[in-house]
Amino acid sequence: MRKAVCPGSFDPVTMGHLDIIGRAAQQYDEVTVLVTANPNKPSGMFTVDERLALIKESTAHFVNVKVDNWAGLLVDYTTANGIDAIVKGLRTALDYEYELPMAQMNRKLAGVDTLFLMTDPQYGYISSTLCKEVTKYGGDVSDMLPPAVAAAIVEKVKS
């Protein structure tokens, strides 16, 4: 069985994320969407448990996708779970420059390969950070987020 992981903070999960997850699910027998702690990002709008619930709801139509969370080294998770590849979406060359050293380190530490998928152009401008910012100022990002996430982000901003 070929297994892949799609790691990220997913705060919140966007349509761009779902596109990458869906494309990974077409190429692998099992895909784990892994909510990870990123020390370079603030604590986030949504708790880890909220993110897990929103991702589970948003990916329920994918029969070979599961959702988990992890706070340690990604390669420790891949090794412990027999995962063959890490799948990451790239929007721009800046994403590549950020992701490449991590991919090389993961390869060196555990021999796990990283598969880069180019973002579908219709999602290339979407980021979780941008969606949160636009929502805080009253903008509508509902077409950039899964329905449950669009509702949840509006509720978060109201509270």
From Swiss-Prot:
Binding-site residues, substrate: S9, K41, L74, K88
The record's section on InterPro entries has:
Cyt_trans-like, PPAT, Rossmann-like_a/b/a_fold
**Looking at the keywords, is Nucleotidyltransferase present?**
yes
> What GO CC terms are in its UniProt record?
cytoplasm
Listed as disulfide-bonded, the cysteine pairs are none
Q: Where is this site: Transition state stabilizer?
A: H17
* GO biological processes: coenzyme A biosynthetic process
Q: Which cofactor does it need?
A: Mg(2+)
Q: Where mainly located?
A: cytoplasm
* Pathway in which this enzyme or protein is active: Cofactor biosynthesis; coenzyme A biosynthesis; CoA from (R)-pantothenate: step 4/5
Record's subcellular location: Cytoplasm
Q: What is its EC number?
A: 2.7.7.3
The entry describes its oligomerization and partners as: Homohexamer.
Q: Which family is this sequence assigned to?
A: Belongs to the bacterial CoaD family.
Function, as annotated: Reversibly transfers an adenylyl group from ATP to 4'-phosphopantetheine, yielding dephospho-CoA (dPCoA) and pyrophosphate.
Q: What is this protein called?
A: Phosphopantetheine adenylyltransferase
Q: Which organism is it from?
A: Corynebacterium diphtheriae (strain ATCC 700971 / NCTC 13129 / Biotype gravis)
